[in-house]
């Protein structure tokens, strides 16, 4: 009887211990696959300020197994800072429906895409119509500019360029001087400071054109290095547009920096002797 009881007791334990690994495995699997969506949503969610939708290489909706490459938002920001400014491309005249993932898919035809940013309005949550693409090499940057400048995406011809084009800067400055007089009144001019190094005239004009008619937009560059000095000026056609721009855009996040927008101080005219 004792032997029989011992046998029965042993058999009763077996079905209890065998299923234990199964629920543990299922629980681990479920929690693993639930992590990537929440992590991705953190980088794509809107905030009270202007925000951007980012696509970072190796972090895609399907690559769940590579989510460990980016553990939190700080790592992604640090990786972005390490990218050379020469590898960043400005993409303007974007359709409002184009997000960072769509832009990344398009530019991957020209090479390896490291990161994509689409800039969104802080109040409406809608795209501002421009963004930035970071490639892996200068050759890929040139290929992307040649391939996609003027490329029609959802009915809109993209404006694609990289770096500060010297010819365009000179033309912009000359155009501003030639427009002197009432239409280029310095009282209708705003100063824009704390600009990210990758922001050029096109990005500045696209952003400020939402508040009125932009007569001139200029980013100031260093003569020796050709790099942005981190500030610029935008001229409107009326004082009302200037006030709208200051109220709406001062403190807005543009490419990772909160820009400063204020009335530009008028310079005394130069006298020729």
UniProtKB/Swiss-Prot annotation:
Residues 166-187 are annotated as: Linker (Gly-rich). It is found in: Plastid, Chloroplast. Residues 87-165, 188-266 form the RRM domain. It holds the Pfam family RRM_1. The keyword Ribonucleoprotein applies. Could be involved in splicing and/or processing of chloroplast RNA's. This is 29 kDa ribonucleoprotein A, chloroplastic. It comes from Nicotiana sylvestris (Wood tobacco).
